[in-house]
Amino acid sequence: MSGEEDLIDYSDDELNNETTAPASNGKKGDAAAAAQNVDKKGSYVGIHSTGFRDFLLKPELLRAIADCGFEHPSEVQQTCIPQAMLGGDIICQAKSGLGKTAVFVLTTLQQVEPVAGECSVLVMCHTRELAFQIRNEYNRFSKYMPDIKTGVFYGGTPIQKDAEVLKNKETHPHIIVGTPGRLNALVRDKHLRLGNVRMFVLDECDKMLDQIDMRRDVQEIFRATPQQKQVMMFSATLADEIKPICRKFMQNPTEHYVDEDTKLTLHGLQQYYIPLEEREKNRKLNELLDELQFNQVIIFVKSTIRATELDKLLRECNFPSIAVHSGVSQEERIRRYKEFKEFNKRICVATDVFGRGIDIERINLAINYDLPADADSYLHRVGRAGRFGTKGLAISFVNSDQDKEVLQQIEKRFEVALPEFPKEGIDASTYMAA
Protein backbone atom coordinates (compact mmCIF):
# COMPACT_ATOMS: atom_id res chain seq x y z
CA MET A 1 0.00 0.00 0.00
CA SER A 2 1.43 3.35 -0.98
CA GLY A 3 1.86 6.06 1.62
CA GLU A 4 0.19 9.43 1.99
CA GLU A 5 3.00 11.10 0.03
CA ASP A 6 1.79 9.35 -3.14
CA LEU A 7 -1.55 11.13 -3.05
CA ILE A 8 -2.06 14.05 -5.35
CA ASP A 9 -3.30 17.11 -3.49
CA TYR A 10 -4.74 20.14 -5.21
CA SER A 11 -3.49 23.42 -3.82
CA ASP A 12 -5.01 26.88 -4.01
CA ASP A 13 -2.20 27.89 -6.35
CA GLU A 14 -3.25 25.23 -8.87
CA LEU A 15 -6.83 26.45 -8.67
CA ASN A 16 -5.75 30.09 -8.97
CA ASN A 17 -3.47 29.50 -11.95
CA GLU A 18 -6.14 27.71 -13.92
CA THR A 19 -7.76 29.71 -16.72
CA THR A 20 -11.24 28.91 -17.90
CA ALA A 21 -12.57 29.92 -21.30
CA PRO A 22 -15.97 31.63 -21.45
CA ALA A 23 -18.88 29.22 -21.65
CA SER A 24 -20.99 29.15 -24.75
CA ASN A 25 -24.53 30.37 -24.97
CA GLY A 26 -26.73 27.67 -23.47
CA LYS A 27 -29.92 26.25 -24.83
CA LYS A 28 -32.95 25.76 -22.64
CA GLY A 29 -33.95 22.18 -21.91
CA ASP A 30 -37.33 21.14 -23.29
CA ALA A 31 -38.80 20.76 -19.81
CA ALA A 32 -37.47 24.11 -18.57
CA ALA A 33 -40.66 25.91 -19.56
CA ALA A 34 -42.54 23.89 -16.95
CA ALA A 35 -40.78 25.74 -14.12
CA GLN A 36 -43.18 28.00 -12.27
CA ASN A 37 -42.82 30.27 -9.23
CA VAL A 38 -39.71 28.85 -7.59
CA ASP A 39 -39.94 29.16 -3.83
CA LYS A 40 -36.57 29.20 -2.11
CA LYS A 41 -36.78 28.19 1.51
CA GLY A 42 -34.61 26.70 4.23
CA SER A 43 -31.11 25.68 3.25
CA TYR A 44 -31.87 24.46 -0.24
CA VAL A 45 -33.94 25.37 -3.25
CA GLY A 46 -37.44 24.37 -2.25
CA ILE A 47 -38.97 21.22 -3.69
CA HIS A 48 -42.58 20.19 -3.17
CA SER A 49 -43.23 16.57 -2.24
CA THR A 50 -46.33 16.52 -4.46
CA GLY A 51 -44.13 17.43 -7.40
CA PHE A 52 -41.82 14.59 -6.56
CA ARG A 53 -44.72 12.17 -6.44
CA ASP A 54 -45.06 12.96 -10.10
CA PHE A 55 -41.48 11.67 -10.45
CA LEU A 56 -42.57 8.45 -8.64
CA LEU A 57 -39.99 8.81 -5.90
CA LYS A 58 -39.86 6.35 -3.01
CA PRO A 59 -42.04 7.22 0.00
CA GLU A 60 -38.89 7.39 2.16
CA LEU A 61 -37.50 10.15 -0.05
CA LEU A 62 -40.79 12.06 -0.11
CA ARG A 63 -40.90 11.93 3.67
CA ALA A 64 -37.34 13.30 3.96
CA ILE A 65 -38.18 16.08 1.48
CA ALA A 66 -41.23 17.03 3.55
CA ASP A 67 -39.14 17.04 6.75
CA CYS A 68 -36.77 19.56 5.16
CA GLY A 69 -39.67 21.91 4.47
CA PHE A 70 -38.97 22.09 0.74
CA GLU A 71 -41.85 23.26 -1.42
CA HIS A 72 -41.33 23.55 -5.17
CA PRO A 73 -38.88 22.01 -7.65
CA SER A 74 -36.44 24.44 -9.21
CA GLU A 75 -36.08 24.73 -12.96
CA VAL A 76 -33.00 22.50 -13.03
CA GLN A 77 -34.75 19.85 -10.92
CA GLN A 78 -37.85 19.83 -13.13
CA THR A 79 -35.65 19.64 -16.21
CA CYS A 80 -33.15 16.99 -15.13
CA ILE A 81 -34.77 14.64 -12.61
CA PRO A 82 -37.20 12.98 -15.07
CA GLN A 83 -34.34 12.38 -17.53
CA ALA A 84 -31.99 11.13 -14.81
CA MET A 85 -34.65 8.72 -13.54
CA LEU A 86 -34.67 7.06 -16.97
CA GLY A 87 -31.03 6.09 -16.45
CA GLY A 88 -29.55 8.03 -19.36
CA ASP A 89 -26.31 10.01 -19.31
CA ILE A 90 -26.68 13.72 -18.49
CA ILE A 91 -24.67 16.93 -18.78
CA CYS A 92 -26.25 19.76 -16.79
CA GLN A 93 -25.22 23.41 -16.57
CA ALA A 94 -27.20 25.73 -14.32
CA LYS A 95 -26.23 28.74 -12.28
CA SER A 96 -25.12 28.46 -8.66
CA GLY A 97 -27.61 27.82 -5.90
CA LEU A 98 -30.48 26.28 -7.87
CA GLY A 99 -30.35 22.73 -6.55
CA LYS A 100 -28.13 20.74 -8.93
CA THR A 101 -26.92 18.64 -6.01
CA ALA A 102 -30.47 17.54 -5.22
CA VAL A 103 -30.83 16.22 -8.78
CA PHE A 104 -28.15 13.56 -8.44
CA VAL A 105 -28.64 12.91 -4.72
CA LEU A 106 -32.35 12.12 -5.12
CA THR A 107 -31.90 10.30 -8.42
CA THR A 108 -29.17 8.00 -7.11
CA LEU A 109 -30.99 7.34 -3.83
CA GLN A 110 -34.07 6.40 -5.84
CA GLN A 111 -32.16 3.88 -7.94
CA VAL A 112 -29.60 2.44 -5.52
CA GLU A 113 -30.03 -1.21 -4.54
CA PRO A 114 -27.74 -1.79 -1.55
CA VAL A 115 -25.59 -4.92 -1.52
CA ALA A 116 -23.24 -5.50 1.43
CA GLY A 117 -19.63 -4.71 0.57
CA GLU A 118 -20.42 -3.14 -2.83
CA CYS A 119 -20.31 0.46 -4.06
CA SER A 120 -23.02 1.21 -6.61
CA VAL A 121 -22.87 5.04 -6.66
CA LEU A 122 -19.64 7.02 -7.04
CA VAL A 123 -19.66 10.83 -6.75
CA MET A 124 -16.53 12.91 -7.31
CA CYS A 125 -15.87 16.61 -6.71
CA HIS A 126 -12.75 18.75 -6.66
CA THR A 127 -12.48 19.86 -3.01
CA ARG A 128 -12.71 18.14 0.35
CA GLU A 129 -15.22 20.65 1.71
CA LEU A 130 -17.59 20.03 -1.19
CA ALA A 131 -17.24 16.25 -0.74
CA PHE A 132 -18.06 16.63 2.96
CA GLN A 133 -21.11 18.75 2.10
CA ILE A 134 -22.42 16.34 -0.56
CA ARG A 135 -22.13 13.44 1.89
CA ASN A 136 -24.20 15.45 4.37
CA GLU A 137 -26.88 16.00 1.71
CA TYR A 138 -27.01 12.24 1.14
CA ASN A 139 -27.40 11.70 4.87
CA ARG A 140 -30.20 14.25 5.01
CA PHE A 141 -32.24 12.76 2.18
CA SER A 142 -31.60 9.12 3.16
CA LYS A 143 -32.67 9.54 6.80
CA TYR A 144 -35.56 7.08 6.29
CA MET A 145 -33.43 4.63 4.29
CA PRO A 146 -31.43 2.98 7.11
CA ASP A 147 -30.00 0.27 4.85
CA ILE A 148 -28.14 2.85 2.73
CA LYS A 149 -24.58 3.60 3.83
CA THR A 150 -22.77 6.68 2.52
CA GLY A 151 -19.04 7.32 2.91
CA VAL A 152 -16.72 10.21 2.10
CA PHE A 153 -13.01 9.88 1.25
CA TYR A 154 -10.55 12.71 0.65
CA GLY A 155 -6.87 13.48 1.05
CA GLY A 156 -5.31 14.89 4.19
CA THR A 157 -6.65 12.07 6.38
CA PRO A 158 -4.99 8.69 7.05
CA ILE A 159 -5.62 6.38 4.10
CA GLN A 160 -5.44 3.39 6.47
CA LYS A 161 -8.72 4.49 8.08
CA ASP A 162 -10.40 4.51 4.67
CA ALA A 163 -8.98 1.06 3.94
CA GLU A 164 -10.44 -0.30 7.20
CA VAL A 165 -13.90 1.06 6.35
CA LEU A 166 -13.77 -0.52 2.88
CA LYS A 167 -12.44 -3.86 4.12
CA ASN A 168 -15.45 -4.52 6.36
CA LYS A 169 -18.71 -5.47 4.59
CA GLU A 170 -20.65 -4.04 7.51
CA THR A 171 -19.13 -0.56 7.08
CA HIS A 172 -18.46 -0.52 3.32
CA PRO A 173 -20.54 2.34 1.80
CA HIS A 174 -23.04 1.77 -0.99
CA ILE A 175 -22.62 5.42 -2.00
CA ILE A 176 -19.12 6.88 -2.05
CA VAL A 177 -18.33 10.60 -2.30
CA GLY A 178 -14.74 11.74 -2.66
CA THR A 179 -11.96 13.69 -4.33
CA PRO A 180 -10.15 12.15 -7.33
CA GLY A 181 -6.70 11.92 -5.75
CA ARG A 182 -7.78 9.89 -2.72
CA LEU A 183 -10.23 7.71 -4.65
CA ASN A 184 -7.60 6.89 -7.27
CA ALA A 185 -5.15 5.90 -4.53
CA LEU A 186 -7.75 3.59 -2.96
CA VAL A 187 -8.49 2.00 -6.34
CA ARG A 188 -4.81 1.68 -7.21
CA ASP A 189 -4.04 -0.05 -3.91
CA LYS A 190 -7.05 -2.36 -4.38
CA HIS A 191 -8.85 -1.15 -1.26
CA LEU A 192 -11.74 0.13 -3.36
CA ARG A 193 -13.27 -2.08 -6.05
CA LEU A 194 -15.66 -0.42 -8.46
CA GLY A 195 -16.89 -3.38 -10.50
CA ASN A 196 -20.48 -2.86 -9.31
CA VAL A 197 -20.80 0.88 -9.87
CA ARG A 198 -24.08 1.71 -11.64
CA MET A 199 -24.02 5.51 -11.33
CA PHE A 200 -20.97 7.75 -11.86
CA VAL A 201 -21.34 11.45 -10.97
CA LEU A 202 -18.99 14.42 -11.41
CA ASP A 203 -20.00 17.61 -9.57
CA GLU A 204 -18.30 20.83 -10.74
CA CYS A 205 -17.04 18.63 -13.58
CA ASP A 206 -15.22 21.41 -15.43
CA LYS A 207 -12.87 21.97 -12.49
CA MET A 208 -11.80 18.31 -12.54
CA LEU A 209 -11.61 17.79 -16.28
CA ASP A 210 -9.80 21.05 -17.01
CA GLN A 211 -6.81 20.18 -14.80
CA ILE A 212 -4.49 17.56 -16.26
CA ASP A 213 -3.63 15.81 -12.97
CA MET A 214 -7.20 15.69 -11.77
CA ARG A 215 -8.49 14.56 -15.16
CA ARG A 216 -5.95 11.72 -15.15
CA ASP A 217 -7.24 10.56 -11.77
CA VAL A 218 -10.84 10.71 -13.00
CA GLN A 219 -9.93 8.68 -16.09
CA GLU A 220 -8.17 6.00 -14.04
CA ILE A 221 -11.16 5.70 -11.72
CA PHE A 222 -13.56 5.65 -14.69
CA ARG A 223 -11.65 2.73 -16.25
CA ALA A 224 -12.13 0.75 -13.03
CA THR A 225 -15.93 0.95 -13.36
CA PRO A 226 -18.18 -1.17 -15.62
CA GLN A 227 -18.77 -0.03 -19.18
CA GLN A 228 -22.55 -0.07 -18.67
CA LYS A 229 -23.43 2.61 -16.12
CA GLN A 230 -25.16 5.97 -15.88
CA VAL A 231 -22.86 9.01 -16.05
CA MET A 232 -24.01 12.43 -14.84
CA MET A 233 -22.00 15.67 -14.88
CA PHE A 234 -22.94 19.01 -13.35
CA SER A 235 -21.46 22.51 -13.27
CA ALA A 236 -22.41 26.17 -13.04
CA THR A 237 -19.97 27.04 -15.84
CA LEU A 238 -19.03 24.86 -18.79
CA ALA A 239 -16.60 26.14 -21.42
CA ASP A 240 -16.87 25.00 -25.04
CA GLU A 241 -13.48 23.28 -24.75
CA ILE A 242 -14.66 21.10 -21.85
CA LYS A 243 -17.92 19.84 -23.37
CA PRO A 244 -16.22 17.38 -25.82
CA ILE A 245 -14.15 16.01 -22.92
CA CYS A 246 -17.33 15.45 -20.90
CA ARG A 247 -18.96 13.62 -23.80
CA LYS A 248 -16.03 11.18 -24.06
CA PHE A 249 -17.15 9.68 -20.73
CA MET A 250 -20.74 9.26 -21.93
CA GLN A 251 -23.02 7.47 -24.35
CA ASN A 252 -25.45 9.77 -26.18
CA PRO A 253 -25.94 12.15 -23.24
CA THR A 254 -28.87 14.55 -22.97
CA GLU A 255 -27.54 18.05 -22.38
CA HIS A 256 -29.39 20.56 -20.22
CA TYR A 257 -28.36 24.21 -20.23
CA VAL A 258 -30.95 25.58 -17.88
CA ASP A 259 -29.78 29.18 -18.13
CA GLU A 260 -28.34 31.00 -21.07
CA ASP A 261 -24.81 32.30 -20.64
CA THR A 262 -25.83 35.91 -20.18
CA LYS A 263 -28.29 34.90 -17.47
CA LEU A 264 -25.69 33.16 -15.32
CA THR A 265 -25.54 36.16 -13.02
CA LEU A 266 -27.54 35.75 -9.84
CA HIS A 267 -30.96 37.30 -9.37
CA GLY A 268 -31.27 39.38 -6.20
CA LEU A 269 -27.51 39.95 -5.93
CA GLN A 270 -26.37 43.60 -5.89
CA GLN A 271 -22.87 43.93 -7.42
CA TYR A 272 -20.43 46.85 -7.09
CA TYR A 273 -16.74 47.63 -7.41
CA ILE A 274 -14.46 50.01 -5.48
CA PRO A 275 -11.36 51.52 -7.18
CA LEU A 276 -8.49 51.90 -4.70
CA GLU A 277 -4.76 51.39 -4.14
CA GLU A 278 -3.39 48.14 -2.68
CA ARG A 279 -2.36 49.96 0.52
CA GLU A 280 -5.94 51.21 0.98
CA LYS A 281 -7.58 47.78 1.01
CA ASN A 282 -7.35 47.06 4.74
CA ARG A 283 -8.81 50.40 5.79
CA LYS A 284 -11.64 50.13 3.26
CA LEU A 285 -12.42 46.57 4.35
CA ASN A 286 -12.62 47.70 7.98
CA GLU A 287 -14.99 50.50 6.97
CA LEU A 288 -17.25 48.12 5.05
CA LEU A 289 -17.41 45.58 7.88
CA ASP A 290 -18.25 48.39 10.33
CA GLU A 291 -20.83 50.12 8.16
CA LEU A 292 -22.61 47.34 6.26
CA GLN A 293 -25.31 45.14 7.72
CA PHE A 294 -24.79 41.45 7.02
CA ASN A 295 -25.55 38.00 8.40
CA GLN A 296 -22.29 36.38 7.31
CA VAL A 297 -19.58 37.58 4.93
CA ILE A 298 -17.00 35.72 2.87
CA ILE A 299 -13.84 37.62 1.84
CA PHE A 300 -11.85 36.20 -1.08
CA VAL A 301 -8.08 36.61 -1.43
CA LYS A 302 -5.62 35.21 -3.98
CA SER A 303 -3.25 33.18 -1.78
CA THR A 304 -3.07 31.20 1.44
CA ILE A 305 -0.52 33.63 2.90
CA ARG A 306 -2.82 36.60 2.31
CA ALA A 307 -5.72 34.64 3.83
CA THR A 308 -3.74 33.91 6.98
CA GLU A 309 -2.49 37.49 7.35
CA LEU A 310 -5.85 39.12 6.68
CA ASP A 311 -7.61 36.78 9.10
CA LYS A 312 -5.02 37.65 11.76
CA LEU A 313 -5.48 41.37 11.10
CA LEU A 314 -9.27 41.14 11.35
CA ARG A 315 -9.12 39.24 14.63
CA GLU A 316 -6.70 41.85 16.01
CA CYS A 317 -9.37 44.44 15.13
CA ASN A 318 -11.94 42.38 17.08
CA PHE A 319 -13.80 41.04 14.06
CA PRO A 320 -15.06 37.43 14.54
CA SER A 321 -13.04 36.00 11.65
CA ILE A 322 -11.97 32.55 10.49
CA ALA A 323 -9.75 31.47 7.56
CA VAL A 324 -10.35 28.51 5.21
CA HIS A 325 -7.62 27.53 2.75
CA SER A 326 -5.31 24.64 1.85
CA GLY A 327 -2.58 25.87 4.19
CA VAL A 328 -4.26 24.31 7.22
CA SER A 329 -4.72 20.61 7.94
CA GLN A 330 -7.74 18.82 6.57
CA GLU A 331 -9.29 18.19 9.99
CA GLU A 332 -8.85 21.86 10.88
CA ARG A 333 -10.38 22.98 7.56
CA ILE A 334 -13.47 20.86 8.13
CA ARG A 335 -13.72 22.09 11.73
CA ARG A 336 -13.55 25.72 10.57
CA TYR A 337 -16.03 25.10 7.77
CA LYS A 338 -18.52 23.63 10.28
CA GLU A 339 -17.90 26.48 12.72
CA PHE A 340 -18.73 29.03 10.02
CA LYS A 341 -21.71 27.07 8.67
CA GLU A 342 -23.14 26.75 12.19
CA PHE A 343 -22.95 30.55 12.56
CA ASN A 344 -20.33 30.48 15.31
CA LYS A 345 -18.27 32.88 13.17
CA ARG A 346 -19.67 35.62 10.94
CA ILE A 347 -16.60 36.42 8.82
CA CYS A 348 -14.67 33.94 6.66
CA VAL A 349 -11.47 34.77 4.75
CA ALA A 350 -10.98 32.24 1.96
CA THR A 351 -9.16 31.39 -1.25
CA ASP A 352 -10.78 29.98 -4.39
CA VAL A 353 -10.74 26.53 -2.75
CA PHE A 354 -13.93 27.80 -1.02
CA GLY A 355 -15.29 29.41 -4.18
CA ARG A 356 -17.38 26.60 -5.69
CA GLY A 357 -20.44 24.73 -4.59
CA ILE A 358 -20.26 25.54 -0.88
CA ASP A 359 -23.79 26.19 0.41
CA ILE A 360 -24.00 28.36 3.52
CA GLU A 361 -27.39 30.00 3.46
CA ARG A 362 -26.63 32.88 5.84
CA ILE A 363 -23.90 34.40 3.63
CA ASN A 364 -25.34 37.58 2.12
CA LEU A 365 -22.13 39.56 1.56
CA ALA A 366 -19.16 38.56 -0.62
CA ILE A 367 -16.08 40.78 -0.89
CA ASN A 368 -13.36 40.27 -3.49
CA TYR A 369 -10.40 41.68 -1.54
CA ASP A 370 -8.38 40.37 -4.50
CA LEU A 371 -10.27 40.21 -7.79
CA PRO A 372 -10.13 36.72 -9.40
CA ALA A 373 -8.32 36.03 -12.68
CA ASP A 374 -11.40 35.46 -14.85
CA ALA A 375 -15.16 35.92 -15.15
CA ASP A 376 -16.04 32.30 -14.31
CA SER A 377 -14.19 32.47 -10.99
CA TYR A 378 -15.95 35.75 -10.25
CA LEU A 379 -19.35 34.12 -10.80
CA HIS A 380 -18.54 31.21 -8.48
CA ARG A 381 -17.19 33.54 -5.79
CA VAL A 382 -20.05 36.02 -5.68
CA GLY A 383 -22.45 33.08 -5.94
CA ARG A 384 -21.68 32.33 -2.28
CA ALA A 385 -23.88 35.35 -1.46
CA GLY A 386 -27.44 35.38 -2.71
CA ARG A 387 -27.74 31.61 -2.96
CA PHE A 388 -31.16 29.98 -3.29
CA GLY A 389 -32.41 33.10 -5.10
CA THR A 390 -32.17 35.27 -1.97
CA LYS A 391 -30.86 38.81 -1.73
CA GLY A 392 -27.15 39.49 -1.41
CA LEU A 393 -24.35 41.99 -1.97
CA ALA A 394 -21.00 41.56 -3.75
CA ILE A 395 -18.22 44.17 -3.65
CA SER A 396 -14.94 43.88 -5.57
CA PHE A 397 -11.75 45.84 -4.91
CA VAL A 398 -10.12 46.99 -8.18
CA ASN A 399 -6.58 48.30 -7.93
CA SER A 400 -4.52 47.23 -10.97
CA ASP A 401 -4.71 47.29 -14.76
CA GLN A 402 -5.23 43.51 -14.67
CA ASP A 403 -8.19 43.99 -12.30
CA LYS A 404 -9.69 46.53 -14.70
CA GLU A 405 -9.36 44.04 -17.57
CA VAL A 406 -11.09 41.32 -15.54
CA LEU A 407 -13.86 43.78 -14.63
CA GLN A 408 -14.38 44.48 -18.34
CA GLN A 409 -14.46 40.72 -19.04
CA ILE A 410 -17.14 40.26 -16.38
CA GLU A 411 -19.28 43.08 -17.77
CA LYS A 412 -18.93 41.81 -21.34
CA ARG A 413 -19.46 38.15 -20.47
CA PHE A 414 -22.62 38.65 -18.43
CA GLU A 415 -23.90 41.77 -20.21
CA VAL A 416 -24.02 43.80 -17.02
CA ALA A 417 -22.55 47.13 -15.97
CA LEU A 418 -21.02 46.94 -12.50
CA PRO A 419 -21.42 50.37 -10.86
CA GLU A 420 -18.93 51.93 -8.49
CA PHE A 421 -19.94 51.52 -4.85
CA PRO A 422 -21.61 54.80 -3.77
CA LYS A 423 -19.57 56.87 -1.32
CA GLU A 424 -22.70 57.39 0.77
CA GLY A 425 -23.24 53.62 0.92
CA ILE A 426 -26.40 51.73 -0.01
CA ASP A 427 -29.75 50.96 1.58
CA ALA A 428 -29.51 47.68 3.51
CA SER A 429 -33.00 46.68 2.34
CA THR A 430 -31.62 46.18 -1.20
CA TYR A 431 -29.49 43.23 -0.07
CA MET A 432 -30.87 42.16 3.33
CA ALA A 433 -33.92 39.91 3.41
CA ALA A 434 -36.85 41.42 5.26
Swiss-Prot record:
Placement of sequence motif DEAD box: 203-206
InterPro entries with a match to the protein in the record: DEAD/DEAH_box_helicase_dom, Helicase_ATP-bd, Helicase_C-like, P-loop_NTPase, RNA_helicase_DEAD_Q_motif
Organism: Chaetomium globosum (strain ATCC 6205 / CBS 148.51 / DSM 1962 / NBRC 6347 / NRRL 1970)
GO molecular function: ATP binding; ATP hydrolysis activity; RNA binding; RNA helicase activity
Annotated ATP binding sites: 94-101
GO biological process, one term: mRNA transport
Name this polypeptide is given: ATP-dependent RNA helicase SUB2
Function per UniProt: ATP-binding RNA helicase involved in transcription elongation and required for the export of mRNA out of the nucleus. SUB2 also plays a role in pre-mRNA splicing and spliceosome assembly. May be involved in rDNA and telomeric silencing, and maintenance of genome integrity.
Subcellular location as annotated: Nucleus
Family statement drawn from the similarity comment of this UniProt entry: Belongs to the DEAD box helicase family. DECD subfamily.
Domain notes: The Q motif is unique to and characteristic of the DEAD box family of RNA helicases and controls ATP binding and hydrolysis.
Region Disordered, residue ranges: 1-32
Entries under PROSITE patterns matching the protein: HELICASE_ATP_BIND_1 (PS51192), HELICASE_CTER (PS51194), Q_MOTIF (PS51195)
